């Protein structure tokens, strides 16, 4: 009965608790219906898209990077999501502790980070949706945007250089900050927030011009899926 089931909740099998893919297994269990994860003692088989060979490559490669390039006492962390082009998650790493116990913090799905320029495609997707063309020309130049109740926003290009007239195609390819901000300001922030949501971004997206440069935090899984 239910009372008995609650006293003996579902647990990961021995195989699922092993180091390889444990972050993936924990994510699946955390995503399962509440009745399945906490109110059943029955044996349940859950079929997933996990690929142990890809997972082993991810863990081996990540371990090598940390051994060769990261100091032993460093607090650096890592998160990896491998997704095939059909949108299925094949491997996941939520931290440098590959054992990834049941209660380990999974950075692939729980950590919120600023995506930076990885958010720019949403700006350009919104532009295309509004009738802009890849050949539409914008002027790459220093800009200032007045924000009520705040300091003037003055985005700069990473290179410190300005190229003058550029197409949207080139602006995206060269990751030009000023054009992304201009475009977002012209299209309207709400349209960008809406299209990001349509692509699967569930984290809260800000309402200021800085979202064009990826200032709003998202998690790695939703960004990869988008």
Predicted regions and their residues:
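Ca2+-coordinating acidic residues in Ca2+-binding motifs
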Residues: 4, 122, 142, 222-225
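Short, conserved catalytic or adaptor-binding loops enriched in Gly and charged residues
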Residues: 31-39, 203
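Flexible glycine/proline-enriched surface loops and loop-helix/loop-strand junctions
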Residues: 39-43, 103-109, 153-155, 163-165, ...
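Conserved catalytic neighborhood of penicillin-recognizing serine enzymes
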Residues: 13-20, 24, 30, 132-192
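Generic beta-strand/beta-sheet core signal
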Residues: 81-83, 90-96, 135-141, 169, ...
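Periplasmic/cell-envelope proteins involved in peptidoglycan metabolism and beta-lactam response
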Residues: 1-20, 37-121, 125, 130-136, ...
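Stable alpha-helical elements in mature extracytoplasmic
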Residues: 1, 24, 28, 32, ...
């Amino acid at each position: 009965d239910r009372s008995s089931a609650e006293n003996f909740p579902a647990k990961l099998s021995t195989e699922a608790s092993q180091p390889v893919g444990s972050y993936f297994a924990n994510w699946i269990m955390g995503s399962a219906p509440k009745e399945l994860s906490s109110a059943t003692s029955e044996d349940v088989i859950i079929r997933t898209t996990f690929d142990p060979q890809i997972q082993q490559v991810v863990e081996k490669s990540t371990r090598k990077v940390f051994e060769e390039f990261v100091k032993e006492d460093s607090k650096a962390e890592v998160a990896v999501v491998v997704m095939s082009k059909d949108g299925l998650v094949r491997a996941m790493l939520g931290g440098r502790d590959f054992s990834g116990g049941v209660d380990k913090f999974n950075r692939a799905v729980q950590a919120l980070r600023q995506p930076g320029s990885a958010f720019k495609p949403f700006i350009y997707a919104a532009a295309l949706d509004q009738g802009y063309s890849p050949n539409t020309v914008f002027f790459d130049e220093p800009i200032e945007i007045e924000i009520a109740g705040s300091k003037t926003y003055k985005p700069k290009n990473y290179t410190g250089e300005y190229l003058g007239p550029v197409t949207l195609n080139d602006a995206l390819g060269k990751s030009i900050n000023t054009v992304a901000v201009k475009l977002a300001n012209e299209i309207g922030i709400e349209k960008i927030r809406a299209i990001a949501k349509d692509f699967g971004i569930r984290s809260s997206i800000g309402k200021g011009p800085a979202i064009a440069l990826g200032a709003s935090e998202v998690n790695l899984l939703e960004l990869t899926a988008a």
